[in-house]
């Protein structure tokens, strides 16, 4: 009897033990399965993050290994004007595209060619020349180095050269708006304009500005001067002071570094100055009425991006009021609100083609007569 009871007890114990083992094995398998699934998910998540990180790095460094350099004109990289704007655009390209960026300053015209050659010798992928004054040097270097890509601001004389991209601007359009503001702002019916050089390119500023002044104020007189330099602040200041003596109470400087002297003279005389190329209000906030902006920074960034994308094809690229390649500075606190509204309407007319702004001698004189002297 005891044997039968013990046998039954033993059988029951073995059954319970087997059941427990079965449950333990099942739980172990389920635990292992869950762990594997979790590991797979974690692995997938890590892979996705790695891919995203890889893509981000790819986007940020798509220009890695590419070198872009700018050669300034004699105004230098701190001219507060288009050389500085060009460098700011290239710095943006360095940050956003991952390119290597560098500038070389030209102290005299004789520096243009050797500066370009320095970048060629250092195997730069794109060399950007800032200003029409570099055109002759670029012509020689682009011919001698057909495999190197070049760009130049404010010159289209090399438009047919396949490895040169010309970056042009409708500066007469924005100069017209600046002139209109000047004509509406002057209290003495006398305003001025100071050019760094009286070339065809620079005279486009003069035609637009003078046209804007006269359309705003038919009684206004426009004093005009050629400083004959983009890097002589003393001459800029003397020239502006002469205009102040002759009654000017608004002066538009289109003279690079020389123009800083113009602004200084206006500040001392407590009259208005109009800046050029970039927003120059930070130089003298209570003196700068507005600035005729030319977005050289955007042009330099754009051609750098085209290099990275493999789309630099040469030819001419022109920036206008329609694509905000030129415009007045955004700050309007020094301009009469009524004039701001009038300027906004003028912008629409220029963009639509209803208002044609003269950018050459023939078109200017056809409407306004022979009142612009710097083209003689």
Tell me what each language-model feature is.
Residues 1-9:
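Positively charged n-region of N-terminal signal peptides that target proteins for export
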Residues 17-20:
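C-terminal motif of bacterial Sec signal peptides marking the signal peptidase cleavage site
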């Amino acid at each position: 009897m005891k044997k039968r009871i013990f046998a039954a007890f033993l059988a029951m114990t073995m059954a319970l033990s087997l059941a427990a083992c079965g449950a333990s094995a099942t739980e172990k398998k389920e635990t292992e399965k869950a762990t594997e699934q979790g590991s797979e998910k974690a692995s997938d998540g890590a892979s996705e993050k790695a891919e995203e990180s890889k893509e981000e790095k790819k986007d940020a460094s798509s220009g890695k290994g590419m070198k872009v350099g700018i050669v300034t004109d004699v105004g230098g990289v701190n001219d507060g004007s288009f050389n500085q704007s060009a460098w700011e655009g290239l710095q943006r390209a360095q940050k956003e595209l991952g390119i290597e960026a560098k500038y070389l300053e030209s102290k005299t015209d004789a520096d243009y060619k050797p500066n370009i050659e320095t970048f060629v010798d250092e195997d730069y992928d794109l060399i950007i020349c800032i200003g029409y004054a570099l055109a002759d040097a670029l012509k020689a270097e682009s011919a001698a180095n057909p495999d190197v890509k070049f760009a130049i601001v404010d010159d289209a004389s090399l438009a047919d050269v396949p490895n040169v991209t010309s970056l042009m601007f409708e500066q007469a359009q924005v100069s017209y708006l600046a002139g209109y503001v000047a004509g509406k702002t002057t209290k003495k019916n006398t305003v001025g304009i100071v050019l760094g050089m009286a070339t065809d390119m620079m005279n486009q500023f003069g035609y637009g500005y003078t046209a804007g002044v006269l359309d705003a104020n038919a009684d206004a007189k426009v004093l005009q001067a050629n400083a004959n330099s983009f890097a002589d602040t003393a001459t800029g200041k003397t020239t502006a002071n002469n205009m102040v003596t002759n009654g000017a109470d608004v002066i538009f400087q289109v003279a690079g570094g020389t123009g800083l002297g113009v602004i200084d003279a206006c500040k001392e005389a407590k009259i208005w100055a109009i800046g050029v190329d970039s927003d120059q209000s930070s130089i003298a906030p209570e003196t700068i009425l507005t600035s005729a902006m030319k977005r050289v920074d955007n042009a330099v960034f754009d051609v750098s991006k085209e290099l990275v994308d493999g789309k630099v094809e040469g030819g001419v690229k022109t920036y206008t009021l329609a694509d905000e390649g030129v415009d007045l500075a955004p700050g309007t606190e020094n301009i009469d609100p009524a004039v701001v509204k009038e300027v906004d309407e003028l912008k629409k007319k220029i963009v639509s083609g209803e208002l044609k702004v003269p950018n050459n001698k023939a078109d200017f004189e056809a409407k306004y007569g022979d009142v612009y002297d710097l083209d003689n």
